[in-house]
Amino acid sequence: MKAIREKVELPEGHSFRVLRWSKSLRDVECILGPGRTQPVQGEGDHWHFHKEVELTLFTGGEGTRFVGDAIGTFAAGDLVLLGERLPHHWHTSAASSGLSIQWHFPESHPVWAFPENLELRELFKRAERGLHLRGRT
């Protein structure tokens, strides 16, 4: 199956996007600031990819995660880091909830000028195939 390319639209003036859902991965809201949200159509329940790195925390529900060529389960408390352009899909048979942060900092972005961020390159390199942390720590 061919993955759908999702075009992530950052809110004006923002360097990353924060998403939240409380029932369905199709019914998502973008958090714009304190008390401000905007509805967006989520693609999490389709096989898709985007150029942004994504960090997703599941706060409720459970299901099956498809990330690249790996298939596994997810449940509340799980954290998943997805590298750029990594195809993924979350399948649930009931309600789920969670938060996602999506960002894209190309090589030329000023964030890489900070010395403390250089070590993040190794983390993002490992996330090219996805990283999954299970449950509460």
List each language-model region with its residue ranges.
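Generic protein-terminus/edge-of-domain signal
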Residues: 1-66, 72
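Conserved GNAT-family N-acetyltransferase fold
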Residues: 56, 80, 101
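Surface loops and adjacent helix of pleckstrin homology
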Residues: 68-70, 92-93
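Residue-level detector of short, conserved catalytic/binding motifs and their immediate flanks
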Residues: 53, 78, 88
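Short acidic-glycine-tyrosine-enriched beta hairpin
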Residues: 69-83
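A hydrophobic/aromatic-rich effector-binding and dimerization subdomain
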Residues: 2-24, 83-137
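Glycine-centered flexibility sites
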Residues: 61-63, 77, 85, 98
